[in-house]
Amino acid sequence: MKSFYITDAGRVRSHNEDSVTIVKNQTGEHLMIVADGMGGHRAGEVASSMVVTHLGSRFANLSTIGTKFDAVNWLNENINTINTNILKYTEENPESTGMGTTVVLALLTKDFLIFGNIGDSSGFVFKNGKLHKITKDHTLVNLLVEAGELAPEEAANHPKKNVRMKALGTETKQVLDVFDVDKNVDAIMLCSDGLT
């Protein structure tokens, strides 16, 4: 498998609070992660870095992730450890109040491919010449679209399109939305909401 990542602050922001990693464990299973930090005093960078550092180092030390069920449990257990660490950091560093991060990840083994997300960073697969979105954004506008209260074509220009309904560092317990995907794909793409 070929893998790479690109990160760029873009034209709007002076600095980038995204963190990204691609790691292999001891049996060659792959974990890909993008985390988009938020919060003042560069706290977003701290939060997003906590995600990729914690998950990446623990995954790299595994001999195997095991079954799909084992993988989901491992991911949620580690996501909640990270979430607790972010909340603790905020408590100990009041200047970082409001700190948090989104996370989107893909886990590829010889037997399965799963995606997981919290927030509005997205996961896609490229298959048969088309890009397919896998994850669902945790935003107010997306909830309104799913509830039938807002037309999809109105979502892009809605004044509250950037209101996140879920992120690490905002609640005491978090659960990844997990998506089981056919592993026979041409490419996997993860991105923060800033990709245009």
Predicted regions and their residues:
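PP2C/PPM-type serine/threonine phosphatase catalytic domain
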Residues: 1-196
